Structure formats: structure tokens, C-alpha cells
């Protein structure tokens, strides 16, 4: 790594820290939504087992009106087992009560349930009746079309189950789920019959209620990467409950492409097939625990004078995997944070991830994939590195003349700058020639940081001593925390620090002052501190990038030189250039 790379990467570290700490958009709490939660009631039946407020018998008619009869019933569970997940549906609310992914384990390498609200379920229809009753369908019992308790699916096999709630003659709510054996997406259809004029403004909401359960060991990292969001008008609306003492709310009108709630590596999303009226997002911290709870809802309107109205959606609960999300063709991959949309995101989506996909077809070892990727990047950037090294070699060769010039014109800065420009021009040297190649690589380096920080492909992938390339490769837990360093010792950053030192040592430099000598030691230490708490995959990449840089520098030093510099002389102070007489004699 040359000196300009040193400066560039120092800037990368500083900008990343500032960006992560201070540049996240602030979410301001907004007023309560018009639909208030049902409160102040007592639990009445042990078999209801709800996370939503249950109601005392005497309060049922007052609370639920014509829906009162549906508040009593027997909960019937249905387990759907396909190649990717095991889901549990409940007839109480016709909701999703459990979702366990088969290909992704938690930090203890165990299967885990993504649904936080496992008692009440995650999905609900929420509306207010004309007589002022607030209805959450998770408080109501539906009748399932199938009495099976378990259904297994593989390949393209599909299964449909219908949940029906009869409110009155010719007045009902029907919810239909359709599962397929080899996909994460679940078709979700809701149908209202006889509800025209029953709801104020004919409005209702379809909600995902509750954040996803965390799966990672580093809870602070989970908190940083958890939020609710909506995709509207080609832009991402994001609500992050960053302050646990506040409750955040956001409502917007308009057509939404989707709503979603995510953790670091997993996401739950509702994707409508017809235009919506708006979205509602809510987020807050959980008292006494490190968890951010979120609600995301789509707003719909029942058309007037329409006896039966249906909405079709896709429910997606699965990994934050770029290829999986992109395959849905609804821009759900926009939920992935790749930094600036105008700079680093194109590098991530169109260069880094496609190369990773290609390499993953050659080997399933992601440690090897990272090493090969680092080698490819060095080969691609070789012309830039060569240009940078040659420029610095020329600058180094000019140093004696630069020092002489500075001494000669120390009292005449204007003349000194003029002479510097002349010398650079005659030598064919651009003072910025060493910096420009590094600056051109900055977007790629930034994009690498974001991809390696968020890529689920590295999660729980081991390499050498690193048990998980998405976590620091800790070889020793200290039991206490060192400021700026952390509570553990990671090996890749130590090796990388050594490689950075060696790379600086063998790289030609145009300066040999004490400050640059100090950087030989300061920068490796800075890199050690910065990378100790970053994913091992990122540390491995930069380690190998520097190892290949060392080999590349040895080769360039051996095959190139600054001997082709033209002969350049300094003007003697106070002496004008001499003219020649005719005949070749000097005047």
C-alpha cells in the first residue's frame, strides 16, 4: 500500500465512522395514529392465549360490537413444512404464528423462530367500524377450510388454506394462504364481503406487527441494522427507532411497492399487487431489553357500492439475500444498505456481488472466494497501481532538486512555485499522479466495506481459525474492553497491520521527513484498531489485498525505474538565460 493509499484509507476510516455515527437520518416522533389500541380489558379464557388484549365477558359486546361472537372459539394450528421453512398458522386471527427457516441458524447454530409476537401472531387486519369499534382480527376466531394439522411440500407442490369469519348473513372476511414447496413467498389474499359503508371511509390496514427476533451474538449490531421501511415512488422510506426512550411513527399517503420489517440478516415484507392508499410505520425500544419493536402496515380503501372486494399480496419472510430479494422483481433488495445510491451501490450491485456469485459456482469456501476476489481486484487495478508507483518514483528522483529549489528560493515563494511547475512539466510528472489512482479506487473500497458488513453469504462460514466470516476472528476474549480496540484480539487485523507496514516500507516515496517515517508505525496501528471489531471476511480481504500489493510492488520496483527523467537544471539566481551569437560564440 503506497503512501497515497495510506492517506486514502485513513480518510475511508474517518468517513465511515462519521457516516455511521452522525449521518443516519433522524426519525422524529409524530402524533398518534387515528386508530387507537384496544386497552383496559381483562383476560377471560386460558385457551385464548393471546398477546393482544383479551376481554372480560361483560365487556365483549361493548368492545367488539357485532364481532363479539367471533371472540370465542378454539384455536386450531396448522403447520406448513416446505423445503425452506416451517410455518405455523393459527385460526385465531388467521395469522402467521411461527416462521422457522431451515437453511439459516442463530448464533448458537440452532433453528429459531423469527416471529416475536408468537402468542398473538404477526399478521392482522386492523379497522374501525362505523360505531367506533377498533377491530384487530387477531382477537377473532376464523374457521379453516382444512382440518389437517401438518402439510409437507416439496418442489413445485402447492397448498391453499382458507380462513373464513362470518360476521352476519352475507357479511364475512376471508383470508387465503397459498404455499409452494421451494419458495419463500406466500400468496396472501383477503376478501371482504358486505362491508361497503360499514367502515368509516371504507378504510382498513393490513399489518405486520412486531420486529423480528434477533439471531446474532452481537445485539448492538442487530440494533444498528433493524428498522421498518416502505418503498414508495422509487424511494425508500425508513423508520429507525434509534432512541429506546422514544416511540417513532410515520404515515404517508400514496402507492407503496412494499412494506418491510428487518433485522440484520432477515426480513418480513408485504408486497401488494394493486395500488395502496398509504403506509403506516411505528417503532420503539423494548423496556428492559435490547430490542426494537416495529409495526409496518399497508392502507387500503374498500370501493364503494362493491359487495365483495379482494386484495392479493405476497408475504415474504426470509433472508436478506440480494439474489433472493432481487428475484421478486419489486425492488425489495433496496432494503439492503450498500451506502450511497449514486456511488457505492452500483459498485456493490453490478461488480462485487456478480463476481461473488460467479466465484461461488467454482467453490463453496468463502474464504477462498475472498482471496480470489482480492487477487482479481489487484489485477484489475494493476494499471492504476503501476501509474501511481512510476509517478512516485519520479517524484522521489526529483527530491534532491526539490530540496535545492526550496533552499534557493526560500525567500521568494512565488518564484519557487514557478520553478516547481517548470520542473514538473519538463520531467513529465503530475504531482497528483500518485493520488488519482487511489481516488479512483475509493468507490470500490467503500462498496467492499458495505458488502462485507451486510452479506449473509459470509454468515456462519468458517475459514482457517475464523469460525464465522461475518464476525471478528477473535482468538482471545480479554474479559474487559480496551477503548478503541474492544474486548477481544482478532488475528486477521494483526496480520494485516504487519502487511501494511511491509508494504509501506518497500514503496517508493517522494518524502523522507519524520512525519512520513512516523506513518510507517501509526497507520498499521490505526488499521489494527479499526478492523479489530469488523467482520473477519473484511479483515481477510484487506490482508490478502495488501499481500498481493507487496508482491506487485516488488515486481514494479524490479521492472521499472526513474532513469528516463530528462536532464533538468535549476536557473541560477539573478542570472538570465544566455543568448548565443551568430557563429555559435557566446556574448
Swiss-Prot record:
<dbReference type="InterPro" id="IPR028053">
    <property type="entry name" value="Membr_insert_YidC_N"/>
</dbReference>
<feature type="compositionally biased region" description="Basic residues">
    <location>
        <begin position="577"/>
        <end position="587"/>
    </location>
</feature>
<feature type="region of interest" description="Disordered">
    <location>
        <begin position="567"/>
        <end position="587"/>
    </location>
</feature>
<keyword id="KW-0813">Transport</keyword>
<protein>
    <recommendedName>
        <fullName>Membrane protein insertase YidC</fullName>
    </recommendedName>
</protein>
<dbReference type="GO" id="GO:0051205">
    <property type="term" value="P:protein insertion into membrane"/>
</dbReference>
<keyword id="KW-0143">Chaperone</keyword>
<dbReference type="Pfam" id="PF14849">
    <property type="entry name" value="YidC_periplas"/>
</dbReference>
<keyword id="KW-1133">Transmembrane helix</keyword>
<dbReference type="InterPro" id="IPR028055">
    <property type="entry name" value="YidC/Oxa/ALB_C"/>
</dbReference>
<keyword id="KW-0653">Protein transport</keyword>
<dbReference type="InterPro" id="IPR047196">
    <property type="entry name" value="YidC_ALB_C"/>
</dbReference>
<feature type="transmembrane region" description="Helical">
    <location>
        <begin position="367"/>
        <end position="387"/>
    </location>
</feature>
<dbReference type="InterPro" id="IPR001708">
    <property type="entry name" value="YidC/ALB3/OXA1/COX18"/>
</dbReference>
<keyword id="KW-0997">Cell inner membrane</keyword>
<dbReference type="GO" id="GO:0015031">
    <property type="term" value="P:protein transport"/>
</dbReference>
<dbReference type="GO" id="GO:0032977">
    <property type="term" value="F:membrane insertase activity"/>
</dbReference>
<keyword id="KW-0472">Membrane</keyword>
<feature type="transmembrane region" description="Helical">
    <location>
        <begin position="338"/>
        <end position="358"/>
    </location>
</feature>
<keyword id="KW-0812">Transmembrane</keyword>
<dbReference type="InterPro" id="IPR038221">
    <property type="entry name" value="YidC_periplasmic_sf"/>
</dbReference>
<dbReference type="InterPro" id="IPR019998">
    <property type="entry name" value="Membr_insert_YidC"/>
</dbReference>
<dbReference type="GO" id="GO:0005886">
    <property type="term" value="C:plasma membrane"/>
</dbReference>
<comment type="function">
    <text>Required for the insertion and/or proper folding and/or complex formation of integral membrane proteins into the membrane. Involved in integration of membrane proteins that insert both dependently and independently of the Sec translocase complex, as well as at least some lipoproteins. Aids folding of multispanning membrane proteins.</text>
</comment>
<dbReference type="Pfam" id="PF02096">
    <property type="entry name" value="60KD_IMP"/>
</dbReference>
<feature type="transmembrane region" description="Helical">
    <location>
        <begin position="432"/>
        <end position="452"/>
    </location>
</feature>
<feature type="transmembrane region" description="Helical">
    <location>
        <begin position="520"/>
        <end position="540"/>
    </location>
</feature>
<keyword id="KW-1003">Cell membrane</keyword>
<feature type="transmembrane region" description="Helical">
    <location>
        <begin position="5"/>
        <end position="25"/>
    </location>
</feature>
<comment type="similarity">
    <text>Belongs to the OXA1/ALB3/YidC family. Type 1 subfamily.</text>
</comment>
<comment type="subunit">
    <text>Interacts with the Sec translocase complex via SecD. Specifically interacts with transmembrane segments of nascent integral membrane proteins during membrane integration.</text>
</comment>
<feature type="transmembrane region" description="Helical">
    <location>
        <begin position="482"/>
        <end position="502"/>
    </location>
</feature>
Amino acid at each position: 500500500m503506497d503512501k497515497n493509499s495510506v492517506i486514502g484509507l485513513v480518510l475511508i476510516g474517518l468517513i465511515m465512522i462519521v457516516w455511521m455515527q452522525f449521518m443516519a437520518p433522524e426519525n422524529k416522533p409524530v402524533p398518534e395514529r387515528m386508530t387507537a389500541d384496544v386497552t383496559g380489558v381483562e383476560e377471560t379464557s386460558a385457551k385464548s392465549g393471546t398477546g393482544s388484549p383479551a376481554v372480560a365477558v361483560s365487556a365483549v359486546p361493548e368492545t367488539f360490537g357485532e364481532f363479539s361472537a367471533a371472540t370465542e372459539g378454539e384455536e386450531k394450528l396448522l403447520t406448513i413444512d416446505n423445503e425452506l421453512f416451517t410455518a405455523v398458522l393459527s385460526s385465531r386471527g388467521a395469522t402467521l404464528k411461527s416462521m422457522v427457516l431451515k437453511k439459516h441458524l442463530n448464533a448458537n447454530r440452532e433453528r429459531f423462530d423469527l416471529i416475536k409476537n408468537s402468542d398473538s401472531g404477526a399478521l392482522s387486519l386492523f379497522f374501525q367500524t362505523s360505531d367506533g369499534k377498533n377491530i384487530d382480527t387477531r382477537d377473532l376466531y376464523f374457521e379453516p377450510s382444512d382440518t389437517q394439522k401438518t402439510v409437507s411440500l416439496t418442489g413445485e407442490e402447492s397448498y391453499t388454506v382458507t380462513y373464513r369469519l362470518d360476521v352476519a348473513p352475507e357479511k364475512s372476511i376471508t383470508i387465503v394462504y397459498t404455499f409452494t414447496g421451494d419458495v419463500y413467498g406466500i400468496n396472501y389474499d383477503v376478501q371482504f364481503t358486505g362491508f361497503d359503508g360499514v367502515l368509516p371511509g371504507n378504510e382498513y390496514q393490513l399489518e405486520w406487527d412486531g420486529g423480528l427476533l434477533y439471531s446474532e451474538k452481537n445485539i448492538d449490531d442487530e440494533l444498528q441494522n433493524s428498522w421498518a421501511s416502505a418503498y414508495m415512488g422509487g424511494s425508500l422510506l425508513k423508520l429507525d427507532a434509534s432512541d429506546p426512550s422514544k416511540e417513532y411513527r410515520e404515515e404517508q399517503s400514496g402507492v407503496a411497492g412494499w412494506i418491510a420489517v428487518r433485522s440484520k440478516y432477515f426480513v418480513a415484507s408485504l408486497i401488494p399487487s394493486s395500488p395502496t392508499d398509504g403506509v403506516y410505520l411505528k417503532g420503539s425500544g423494548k423496556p428492559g431489553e435490547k430490542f426494537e419493536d416495529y409495526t409496518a402496515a399497508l392502507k387500503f380503501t374498500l370501493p364503494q357500492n362493491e359487495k365483495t372486494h379482494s386484495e392479493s399480496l405476497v408475504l415474504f419472510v426470509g433472508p436478506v439475500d440480494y439474489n433472493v430479494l432481487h428475484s421478486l422483481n419489486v425492488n425489495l433488495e433496496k432494503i439492503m444498505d450498500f451506502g450511497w445510491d449514486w456511488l457505492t451501490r452500483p459498485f456493490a450491485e453490478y461488480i462485487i456481488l456478480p463476481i461473488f456469485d460467479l466465484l461461488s459456482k467454482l467453490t463453496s469456501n468463502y474464504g477462498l472466494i475472498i482471496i480470489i476476489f482480492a487477487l482479481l481486484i489487484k489485477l484489475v487495478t494493476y494499471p492504476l497501481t503501476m501509474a501511481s508507483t512510476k509517478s512516485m518514483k519520479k517524484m522521489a528522483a526529483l527530491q534532491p532538486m526539490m530540496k535545492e529549489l526550496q533552499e534557493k528560493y526560500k525567500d521568494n515563494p512565488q518564484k519557487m512555485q514557478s520553478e516547481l511547475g517548470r520542473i514538473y512539466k519538463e520531467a513529465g510528472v503530475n504531482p497528483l499522479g500518485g493520488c488519482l489512482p487511489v481516488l479512483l479506487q475509493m468507490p470500490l473500497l467503500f462498496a467492499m466495506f458495505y458488502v462485507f458488513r451486510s452479506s449473509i453469504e459470509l454468515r456462519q462460514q468458517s475459514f482457517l481459525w475464523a469460525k464465522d466470516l461475518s464476525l471478528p476472528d477473535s482468538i482471545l476474549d480479554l474479559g474487559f474492553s480496551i477503548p478503541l480496540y474492544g474486548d477481544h484480539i482478532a488475528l486477521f487485523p494483526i496480520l494485516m497491520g504487519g502487511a501494511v507496514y511491509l508494504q509501506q516500507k518497500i514503496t517508493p516515496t517522494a518524502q523522507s521527513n519524520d512525519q512520513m517515517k512516523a506513518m510507517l508505525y501509526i497507520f498499521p496501528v490505526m488499521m489494527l484498531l479499526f478492523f479489530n471489531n469488523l467482520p473477519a471476511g473484511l479483515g481477510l480481504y484487506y490482508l490478502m489485498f495488501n499481500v498481493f500489493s507487496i508482491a506487485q510492488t516488488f515486481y514494479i520496483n524490479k521492472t521499472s525505474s526513474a532513469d528516463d527523467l530528462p536532464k533538468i537544471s535549476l536557473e541560477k539566481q539573478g542570472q538570465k538565460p544566455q543568448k548565443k551569437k551568430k557563429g555559435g560564440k557566446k556574448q
